[in-house]
């Protein structure tokens, strides 16, 4: 009888510890990965019998290890349930958007022409940004996640007007940006990657973009806010 009582007491103690652990405050860590692969490779992946998120992520990582794909960006952000959070790793690119004609049009002979004066500027954030809003489903390991991952790249500078002044090249150039972004809400099993979007990067030259695909994977983990030790 005594061993039985001891076993029951031990079981109750373990259950109490588990219940106490469940009642501890929790954080949610969100990991977003952008993985660039070839379009035919994506077609082959989606044609398989197992197209679950973890399986597709394993296949994408295998391509990365074989140099057939590359991880373009990884963003990790932790917050409490039902709280919004954001991160940004950016560089501000300031560029002119409006020009005024030169103040004088009656130029003396042989004087170099005057370039239009810069009148207005804009600032564009170039880099990676992430916004998240996770919540826990009570009594389960399911996580409802709203998130907005975004990558902005400066692709090139296009020349709008060629001009040379007394100091050298003073041509007017405008930046061309490329933005990869999605905005969605999904329900995830904690600790498992899920494929939430496929983005088509644009080529530098006009024409259909059919060679590359950008896979967006997301994973959310439940973390205790207070250490158990």
Can you say where each PLM-predicted feature lies in the sequence?
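Bacterial N-terminal signal peptides
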Residues: 7-15
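A short, compositionally biased domain-edge/stem linker segment
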Residues: 15-21
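Positively charged n-region of N-terminal signal peptides that target proteins for export
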Residues: 1-4
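Extracytoplasmic assembly/pore-lining segments of large envelope/extracellular complexes
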Residues: 21-160, 176-229
